[in-house]
Amino acid sequence: FDGATGKVVNISDAIGYPMFVESYDQPAPAPAYGIAGWTADGNHVFLYDAYDWWKVDLTGERQPECLTKGYGRKHGKSIRKMTSNIDKDVFQKDETVIVSLWDKNTMDEGVYQLDMKGRLKKLMEGPYTYNIYRFSDNHKYCVWNRQNITEFRDLWWSKADFSNPVRVTNVNPQQADYKWGTVKLVKWTNYENKENKGLLYLPEDYDPQKEYPVLVQFY
């Protein structure tokens, strides 16, 4: 919407992919995937589809450009900006941003660096959920965490590129006194002939020859 002229322009239609959450099943309008930020000159906005970033001309006169060059859709990974104390909504041409790449097939997550030319650089990746807490004022160091079923979300300290990581807390030492568990990704075909995915949690001493009670959660 142009406040000066009152003109409304659809700036995302030419992208060719839905900009809303297609799988949304609530009795309400589906939410948009959202906005990643803006260019410093104020002429473009970065929008998300299910996988990638799009650089979109606010006037609608120029064709949208896929900043991430379709990498997310090609590899089945959702690329999103990660939060931290240095997060910006406005990006200069020479800036980089830390993004997460969540693999929709394996459920693994990666932390990458994305520049404004669309180049991605992998910093770390694995069967974890990652969170960034703070970068140092000089942007040389970072505090972050990772977690999964077997690893508690302790704090880690590293260089800003996440190299040479050192765990600095041990918040859940009592975990070592208990039998814990494992998890694996399972897939099946539902009654609509569509593939579903789920996480199967097993006890630490699981014996496939025995029967166990099962709890199932659908969401």
Segments (PLM) and residue ranges:
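A flexible loop/linker signature enriched in serine peptidases of the S9 family
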Residues: 1-32, 46-54, 73, 101-110, ...
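Surface-exposed loop/turn elements that mediate protein-protein interactions on large endomembrane-trafficking
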Residues: 2, 6-9, 62-69, 111-123, ...
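Beta-strand C-termini and the immediately following turn/loop, strongest in propeller blades
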Residues: 1-3, 37-38, 44-52, 57-58, ...
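Short solvent-exposed loop/turn micro-motifs enriched in small/polar/acidic residues
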Residues: 29-30, 38, 126, 178-181, ...
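Serine-hydrolase catalytic core recognition
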Residues: 131-219
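Beta-sheet entry/capping signal
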Residues: 8, 35, 43-45, 52-54, ...
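Surface-exposed loop and turn segments in beta-propeller and other repeat-based domains
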Residues: 6-30, 67-89, 170-184
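Extended, charged coiled-coil "arm/hinge" scaffolds of SMC/Rad50-like chromosome-maintenance ATPases
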Residues: 113-116, 122-136, 142
